[in-house]
Amino acid sequence: MLGDVASLAEELRVAAGQEPADLYIKNIQIVDVYTETIFSGSLVIKNGKIVAVNPGWEVEAKEVFDGKGRFAVPGFMDAHIHIEPTLLSPEALASVIVPWGTTTLFADPMEIANVAGLKGVEALLNNTENLPYQIYIEVPSRVPTAPGLETTGGVLGVKEVDQLLQSNISASLGELDPSKILSIKEEYLAKIVSARANGKVANGHAIGLNWDQLNVYATAGLSDDHESVVFQELFERLRLGIKALVREGSTERNVEALVKGAIEQNLSTENLIFCTDDKHVNDIVREGHISFNVQKAIALGLNPIKAIQMATINTAKHFRLDHYLGALTPGKVADIVLLDDLVEIKPAYVFKNGKLVAQGGKLTQQIEISQYPAFLNETVKLPPNLAPTSFALPSQGNRCKVNVINLYPDQIINFASQEWLNVAGGEVQVNTNEDILKLAVVERYGKNGSVGVGFVRGFKLKAGALASSVSHDHHNIVIVGTNDQDMDLAAREIARHQGGLVAVENGQVIGVLPLPIGGLMSSLPAEQVMSQIDQLNKKAEQLGCDLPAPFMTLSFISLPTVPELGLTDCGLIHVLEHRIIPTVVETE
């Protein structure tokens, strides 16, 4: 779509009315994100680009589309997404995001990078050229996220990061762990310098930072942050020139608090941008994608055009692509969404590069799922000596005090507490009555066979175990359970499928979703994946769990960059202190 001289000359002749257009969309209400107005008009399209708005000459076109008075808005953009946690391949993802009006993703493939390094990223991108949406990558900056505190399958150093930043498909340096900036790790500073040299912005991950720490982070050149949970955090970031990505994922529900605050404080939305970060396929199908962020903001009282700006032109400006994306004006790519109204954001028609790609909630053409390289289908290698005893936590005495990870509803952050648990047979016991369950992370790359064991509150399981090979960002096998035998079985079932989500009860596998592509993504169409997730969520509910997205929640407990605690295969991590702490702190 960058074009050449001949193509540009052709577009100019069409713009001047000298040659026929490819497509003429007439009888529409154009939502202008520059002037924040709506006007009746038409769009002339050539070579996938808008070349004229409301021309004063009679239009000739190969195809004429009557919008029948519908509202025309620019294609929606997700400013920060990880494709892998949708559990879909990029091809399968098209069927669930494009009908909701998403035409551009800014995606950080850190998940596949942590599993398989640069060749994993390249394999993922090899199958994206002919999709009905555009992918720009946020080049993974943290592979691994916490060196020395986790085991990963792949590593991306400065050389690999610089190579990806030089590519036209990259838009930015992906989110940087604050600890690397605050401790002035030169390897990570080199990645920021590379991004600047290549004309790319650097994305942030400023979770839990105070004002003084944010000053350091902003000085390093981190340009945005998607981790604001309350309005005060968003406001502080804006004050320091850090743009705020307003997130609504499966477990990170931040739109209401942040948009409400912006409305109440009469805050300009110019530097507010929508993203999803991590959202399961079933939530996208039921709610929408970026369209859901827009609709929710409008329902909260935000001016519809401002909400649309947060999904279009604000995003394009941030990534320095507003010469090409984000508005329905001449010279921009013809990514167009037609809506019946600006209250329920449910697209009637979606155009990508001037081609009709979705209508009435369905793609106009089926997308085939590609074959992925064999190395991505062979990423799970369990420790050879793994057994139920691998999940035991030895202790002296009759009871012991342990560090516990406590969940917050609808958030990925957690808080730490210390609780007393009984000891029997020399092993620490779970307490299902108090909802204190065992948590484990099993190294799955065949490197060291390490197993980290801890405790978590918030899952409310009364029996069995849940497990996932999606566990941020290292993507080892994370398991929550009431007993060691079911936890061991869950790990083995994941290995049998070379990745997946699993539910186990009393020595029986009661549910599984295989994720053979890197242990992260399914090779099935979206409808089948959605059905299997729904079944798994019901199985989790039968075991006592009342979380709306239990497997998404489980995947974040192992993240060593989200406060307060995280569990990896190396042990329990104090996130802000960036060190391993003991699970058992006292016995008696």
Curated annotation (Swiss-Prot):
GO biological process per UniProt: adenine catabolic process
Keywords of the record: Hydrolase, Manganese
E.C. designation(s): 3.5.4.2
TM stretches of this protein: none
Catalyses which reaction(s): adenine + H2O + H(+) = hypoxanthine + NH4(+)
Cofactor(s), by name: Mn(2+)
NCBIfam families: ade
SUPFAM superfamilies linked: Composite domain of metallo-dependent hydrolases, Metallo-dependent hydrolases
Family annotation (Pfam families): Adenine_deam_C (PF13382), Amidohydro_1 (PF01979)
InterPro entries: Adenine_deam, Adenine_deam_C, Amidohydro-rel, Metal-dep_hydrolase_composite, Metal_Hydrolase
UniProt-listed HAMAP family: Adenine_deamin (MF_01518)
The organism's taxonomic lineage, starting at the top: Bacteria, Bacillati, Bacillota, Clostridia, Eubacteriales
Family to which this protein belongs: Belongs to the metallo-dependent hydrolases superfamily. Adenine deaminase family.
Single GO MF descriptor: adenine deaminase activity
Disulphide bridges, residue numbers: none
Name the UniProt record assigns to this protein: Adenine deaminase
